[in-house]
Amino acid sequence: MNIQQALNHITKNIHLTQPQMEEIMRSIMQGEATEAQIGALMMGLRMKGESIDEMTAAARVMREFAIKIDVSDIKHLVDIVGTGGDGQNLFNVSTASSFVIAAAGATIAKHGNRGVSSKSGSSDLLEQAGIHLDLDMQQTERCIREMGVGFLFAPNHHKAMKYAAGPRRELGIRSIFNLLGPLTNPAGVKRFVIGVFSDELCRPIAEVMKQLGAEHVMVVHSKDGLDEISLAAPTTIAELKDGEITEWTLNPEDVGIESQTLNGLVVADATASLKLIKDALSKNKSDIGEKAANMIALNAGAGIYVAGITKTYAQAVAFAQDIIYGGQALEKMSVLAEFTKTLKQSQAD
């Protein structure tokens, strides 16, 4: 099936099969599809609604084309990642949570990009923190193995995605490519916390991850519209564990955290995001820092739990709070910045 035939199917509201979608995705990754065709595909799938088979097939092909890092032998290897597109411009919760999860004894291989629809993507924030992302594959692997936390800058690993970059930028809508980012970690990760931009995606994304061989996954979307676990509202969760998917709703009070509004947690840019995160992870916090710390604990707890460090989510949230208030997460951030600086200097010598 060529992309024109696929578009014809999609306009009739017909889902593509996995083999059909794999063929279309390969044509995009090999530079055979025009930008107009890619843009039309993005819009058509968005209007129709991406099926589980379409997402699974596209993710499988994208993984096939990825430049990989093999750290799959590491125990407790996890990624915490969001689709973006919640439009609320909160501080970068998942990136802050990464340092807490790593300080808890899990290993983070975080797959991220610059902000597409938000003001602070993970890469924007990390660069502000002095963490170098322009590392080669061996250096990134060293960060993961030696520091317990490494960041996989998506364009370095998914070079074939350059063909979709123009349409994504020009259309400015969330699309199947926003969904694929969290599904295509190039480090062989099988444990994930994935935030999605609609609660209707929670179960389907869990189903996709099951087909892709994941072991333990929490797919989350909060009732106030966040692609993460919210401090201000219940969060819908689809959890894949031991091959089974269960759906449940989480209230912060369920794990001993008082619900609060998100006032004060919105940031203008990566600089403001970093300032708030450093406040939240420090031992002496402002009132807004305390609130941000609670938000981080809810999300870091999910990562600690799916990584297999604790048996329950509630235990993991309590552990995350201990780490945040003990200052270990902030220390992990500064140590990683220093380590990447050393790697870059040795590269230059």
Curated annotation (Swiss-Prot):
It holds the Pfam family Glycos_transf_3. Its EC number is 2.4.2.18. Mg(2+) 1 binds at residues 94, 228. Keywords: Amino-acid biosynthesis, Aromatic amino acid biosynthesis, Glycosyltransferase, Magnesium, Metal-binding, Transferase, Tryptophan biosynthesis. It comes from the Bacteria. Mg(2+) 2 binds at residues 227-228. SUPFAM superfamilies: Nucleoside phosphorylase/phosphoribosyltransferase catalytic domain (SSF52418), Nucleoside phosphorylase/phosphoribosyltransferase N-terminal domain (SSF47648). Its cofactor is Mg(2+). GO terms for biological process: L-tryptophan biosynthetic process. GO terms for molecular function: anthranilate phosphoribosyltransferase activity; magnesium ion binding. The keyword Nucleus does not apply. Binds 2 magnesium ions per monomer. Catalyzes the transfer of the phosphoribosyl group of 5-phosphorylribose-1-pyrophosphate (PRPP) to anthranilate to yield N-(5'-phosphoribosyl)-anthranilate (PRA). It is an enzyme of class 2 (transferase). Belongs to the anthranilate phosphoribosyltransferase family. Anthranilate 1 binds at residues 82, 113. HAMAP family: TrpD. This is Anthranilate phosphoribosyltransferase. It comes from Acinetobacter baumannii (strain ATCC 17978 / DSM 105126 / CIP 53.77 / LMG 1025 / NCDC KC755 / 5377). 5-phospho-alpha-D-ribose 1-diphosphate binds at residues 82, 85-86, 92-95, 110-118, 122. Homodimer. Pathway: Amino-acid biosynthesis; L-tryptophan biosynthesis; L-tryptophan from chorismate: step 2/5. InterPro entries: Anthranilate_Pribosyl_Tfrase (IPR005940), Glycosyl_Trfase_fam3 (IPR000312), Glycosyl_Trfase_fam3_N_dom (IPR017459), Glycosyl_Trfase_fam3_N_dom_sf (IPR036320), Nuc_phospho_transferase (IPR035902). One of its GO terms (cellular component) is cytosol.
